[in-house]
């Protein structure tokens, strides 16, 4: 098989992985390139709709918070704006008095490390989230006063109109016009069939000093080495490309982009999910830790050990996912 990233055809290693999120258990051929390290599906299924049912986690419709008018609504926006971009004395005081912990955690998750500074995030930033599902993170940003935000996802049933100018379009990156300061791919890039075309298109849509944030699972990780086809973030067949720390920068460079920072942000999920797959337990099984933590096969102590190990792997750059911050060459 010829690598669709670097073109190498020699010595590539074949693997057979099963669909295990929903427990369909149908098999798919993958291969790993011996040159760039990218693990990729051999043949993309002609119809992927079966693997993105309405219950797929990112497609679940979120309900926007009820807008509070007057001084209360104004204060909430100031508080939440500070939670995203910590500037302003009033916002700081309001945040201290009544912090929006959900928003703070969401920002830390979506822009890990010093992502806010790297992306140059401001309330005036033009932000595009590609493959955002129903747009839960954008909804939070919009409620915090970030008005120039938009999402797009190919697998939505239809375009979502949240009101106040927030729209999540049904479509692909090619359907988006205009120029953007921040373009985000939060665990969506690996679902797309042509990484080079995607990043080239994103680079054309990016402002001169803009930033592209690509958060992806990494095959150059301890989890892949340990679990192989039972690695939970292989996620056959939805993940077409599982990049390495060599293949992603290579694609970025060909698209006219450079990697300015890599922040590892893997979690305990890489362990409990993969351990379940080894035991033929799907993510949506009633005995899954994700469905019923108390009824799962894991003790509280085991989950805590998984969390500690994930932190250690991130520190040694061996975690199974990371955020790549890209800028134009």
Where do the PLM segments sit?
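Short glycine/proline- and charge-enriched loop/turn segments
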Residues: 227-235, 276-282
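N-terminal juxtadomain amphipathic helix
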Residues: 1-79
